């Protein structure tokens, strides 16, 4: 797809799923045919890293730690772990580096340089997404998706069930 490092991140709303995600990150919950990580891997053909709570990072994060993603100078493409519909991802990957996608104020995704990533990785690792979003908005081009283009974001555990049928249909081409 591109020359990016693909990174899924948990945001503050992981707490809504606390009973389901004590031993796994939010991006490991299945909705439709895939988990968010499996879906992104199937869509891009790339290895997908994850940023999650510190007690899970050793198992689900980058092997050498989050800051190892900066070592080779490739840009990062960040994807919110609550996003189920990834139709917007190709546009973000094709956008200029340092572009941020917002969905009604929520950080949906970003294509960022390693320099800008070094300023926000701490916030992402700590699920302080509001701070990361504010920092990204200071230095990057911001795109607020119009209502018609907004993807489905899971917000509560029952969304995994509610969105499952629709998501299976979206996942069929990736199977």
Per-segment meaning from a language model:
Residues 1-175:
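Terminal amphipathic alpha-helical/low-complexity segments used for targeting or macromolecular assembly
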